[in-house]
């Protein structure tokens, strides 16, 4: 295992994931997103268990509230944290669903796979570096980041907005 201890597998770390694999009679439902299919194949080979094939995933930011699309109407002057901004002021735009732009997702990513775009104010995922560990998903208080299958030829279909209001 890669020893990333990211928790992307659903266990508190690589050691706990390894223990769960050793104690199982099947690797179904178990996957190390950092190591990918090749690591799971090796784990299966060592344990004498077939590793189920899991489609690779990547983090997707479901917000198009760029500086142009969702202009700032407030000035948030507090700790630079999406979690805090969401709980206290609701952010600087009128959109109560979109990205707050403080970069909690960037801080959570230990693989340097997500960065804030200074022009749009939104996070952008580097698909080549993203391991789909889910740390950015957990860090986002607005739940605008999802793990999606990479898709054929790295193509995905998704709506770049999580607003559920009518109209």
Language-model segments: which ranges?
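Ferredoxin-type iron-sulfur electron-transfer modules and their immediate structural context
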Residues: 1-122, 127-129, 135-167
């Amino acid at each position: 295992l890669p020893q990333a201890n990211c928790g992307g597998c659903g266990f508190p770390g690589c050691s706990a994931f390894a223990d769960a694999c050793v104690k199982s009679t099947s690797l179904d439902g178990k996957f190390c997103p950092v190591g990918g299919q090749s690591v799971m194949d090796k784990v299966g080979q060592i344990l004498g268990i077939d590793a189920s094939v899991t489609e690779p995933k990547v983090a997707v930011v479901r917000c198009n509230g760029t500086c142009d699309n969702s202009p700032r109407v407030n000035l948030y002057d507090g700790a630079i944290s999406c979690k805090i901004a969401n709980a206290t002021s609701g952010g600087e735009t009128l959109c109560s669903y979109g990205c707050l732009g403080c970069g909690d997702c960037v801080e959570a990513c230990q693989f340097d796979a997500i960065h804030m775009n200074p022009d749009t104010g939104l996070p952008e995922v580097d698909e080549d570096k993203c391991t789909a560990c889910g740390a950015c998903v957990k860090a986002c208080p607005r739940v605008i980041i999802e793990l999606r299958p990479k898709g054929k030829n790295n193509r995905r279909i998704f709506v770049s907005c999580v607003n559920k209001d009518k109209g």
